[in-house]
Amino acid sequence: MEVELTNIQKATSSDYWSLASNQYPCGKFPKVSVGVTIPRTSSVSRGRDAASTAAFEKNLSQGTDGRSRPPKMDNASLQVSPEAANHGGSAKEVPKPVPAKVSVSQPDDNAIEQTGTFSFGTRREQDSHLDQLDRPPLVSSQGKRQVESADKNKPNSEMLRMKLWEILGGTSQNKEAVASPNPEDIETPCQPKSQIANGPSSGRQKVFTSPVPYNIKTPAQFNSQTANKPSSDPIESDSDSPQVVEVRPITRSLGRKKEPTGSTHQDKSGSAKKPLSTHRSTPKQKILDNVFAFNDKCTPKTVGKSANGESGSLRNLRSLSRRAKVEPKKAHCSDRISHKTTQDDMERKVPSKYIPSEKKGEKTNSFSSLSRTGKTAESCSRSPKRERRVNTMANVGARKMQLSENLLVKTLNDGEHKLSSPQLTSFKSKGKCSSISPQQKENDNTHIPEASDRTAARNSFNSTPSPAANPSPVLRKYSWEHDENPAINGKSGQKDASPLADRFSDMPDDFASPTFAANIKISPHRSKMLDDDLFSSKYPKGVNRSRSTSFTSDPESEPLDKMEKTNELPGSESPNSQEERQNRKQPHLSPLSPIESEGAQISIPSFRKGYKSHKWLSDVDSPDKSSIEHLGRKSHLKEGRKGKRQLTSPTHFATSGTQETMSDKEPEKVPENYLTRAFDQLVVVLGRFQTKIKSETRNKSSKILAATGEIIRQHLEGVEGQMQADVDKLVNAGKSKRKRLESTFEEQQEKLRILHEKFKEEVNQQLLGCKNSVEDFEAYHAELKGVADKQKASHKKLLQNAEKTVGAQLSDAETKIAEVQKRARKRMKGLKFVLKELIAETAE
């Protein structure tokens, strides 16, 4: 892979922003020259190198978003430190050239070149120099700057990233880099993962698989940004304030020994024309092919930067590495890249720069993923053809963009709008389909400028091109040439993604996906189909599209979800970042190979399935498309858990020629406000659950009371019947006896009357008889009274028994009701406890 320095210089309107320019001293990192090919020693452990490469690229993807990249300036691109290139936040904070500072703390160009182990224009041979470099010297400087950056970084975003990373299970592949006690590995979240190479001299060296350079700026952007030059090592913190500039430790080479400037310069000049060395065994190359690094906006980054140690790429790598250290699992799916470059596009993109003439086919296959993922602005800056293309795009980008869109519309209407299977697979794994909505096509066709530059650039860069995106090789010789012009690319990041970025920020129902962006040109029919499947009750409304985009690209950040939350506002990115994302955005428009087109068709159903499988709380609030992740984003959320978090380990791409297949384990990201929305939806769910519990409790209580009342009623009826029977019996017996007594008394009276006549004779006898009758009557009365008293006592006992029975029934009913209420309260307490834990986890 030869780096054509002259071509790069020609491609750029100014040598200042030509990162490949070799007119600057090699000893100064700020002055980056592309094309240094460092012979890579065979001692580099392939397994670890590949693993760390994958992890690093994923970390780079998560760590490098438009927010953290400094706007490039005419001289700033050559003068800025690597961190400044990556994290120079807004346009106001353009890195300032500090050659002395950089030369002291940074590794030499070779060490920096090492970071570009496999980037466009970078040779794998550079790993040997990397292996030979000593790591310790920069550790202290890194720690120092790390402390500085830590103060400026908002802990919330880092904590959220870490949380999401854990949820996503990001430690699986990047466990080595993450578990490393090294401050470079852990403390600097933006620090990219480095491949561990066992160099002959340093023993174990970290070879940074730096992301593809993305700080190329059009002359217009440079002119607008020339005045602002921040310190040599400014990086934008991940906090919500994009203006915060952090000076992170120069850990690009992770303490590698700085080689002499002369040797570095020689390496640069020598490697400029050398093809990429094929030392790497085929397995190693395959591993690298499968490795894709993406920034938070899913900007593909090849597992390597230019070996010539360009200051812009080094700075980007360092800032990215800081993030990557904390978020090793941030494997951002380069969906658009996976299918965006065919073999021919790869050969065109990397004609002599990456592929030796005798092994160009082999290099195309082995580095197809790299070339596809690495077609970022930074790599373009180092690639002479990319520089030339950038220059050309400034002039004819609008015309090509118009033609491309016209052809795209026609092709999409013809049914040729096939998304690549890797892209759809990544879509499925991430569940991010917001960019393929019908609005996306509108955004692609409208080219409306957007105030949110980073969002626009991110969306446009992250978009997945359909085969129609590349109307023809003639119309767009290079995949990134289709829509570049200074107005769209450099100044406002307005490209097709701008409307989509607006959509991301304005459309609450859809969760923006970095993998899908405005460049995806899908027919209304396909868009509607995807919208129906992908945007149904998936994510909560009000999701910040730019945040969600960068956030979804981070598997660790769901949420979510499953959830890295980029705290920077979409409009905060600098024009440089915009143009860089535009430049990176270009490669994904290369025509899809037939295989990729077929894969795209096949992948759509599975993508929908995977996308739906990542729903966290979709049933909670379907209108809001809740994914209380991601809530797995996060929910993640969804999701955040956020789960919620269907988020998985970083995506690997299986590269076959120019086709990469993204693994279904692509983590899902969640926007920062995802937690709030998740909480709101959880509150809604809690309210519904509470209402349901209360309703059930009332129903059960009513049933219990009704049953108890029926039992009591029946019992009382029985008691009443028994009492009535006893009373009736007593009354009947009394009446009969009374009747007999009355008859007897009447007879006695009658006799008395008779005897009255015989008064004297029989008066005593009759009086005695009456007296006896009266006595008998009194005795009966006493007896009757005694019987009545007995029955009264019996009835009293019956009433007492009935009362006891009724009380027991009522007590039983109350006990049952209390148990029901207790269970309801217990459930509510459990739900509240789970909710608190969820809120605590998501808040962390």
Swiss-Prot record:
Expressed in pollen mother cells and the ovule tissues during meiosis. This is Meiosis-specific protein PAIR3. One of its GO terms (biological process) is homologous chromosome pairing at meiosis. Its main location: nucleus. Keywords: Chromosome, Coiled coil, Meiosis, Nucleus. It holds the Pfam family ASY3-like. The keyword Ligase does not apply. Residues 41-389, 418-506, 532-604, 616-669 are annotated as: Disordered. Signal peptide: none annotated. Residues 731-765 form a coiled coil. It is found in: Chromosome; Nucleus. The keyword Isomerase does not apply. It comes from Oryza sativa subsp. japonica. Residues 122-134, 145-164, 256-270, 324-363, 441-456, 616-640 have a biased composition (Basic and acidic residues). Disruption phenotype: Sterility in both male and female gametes. It comes from the Eukaryota. GO terms for cellular component: chromosome; nucleus. Plays a crucial role in homologous chromosome pairing and synapsis in meiosis. Does not seem required for cytokinesis. Is essential for meiotic bouquet formation, homologous chromosome pairing and normal recombination, and synaptonemal complex (SC) assembly. Required for the proper association of PAIR2 with chromosomes. Residues 459-473 have a biased composition (Low complexity). Residues 106-120, 191-208, 218-229, 364-382, 420-440, 545-554, 646-661 have a biased composition (Polar residues). InterPro entries: ASY3-like, ASY3-like_CC.
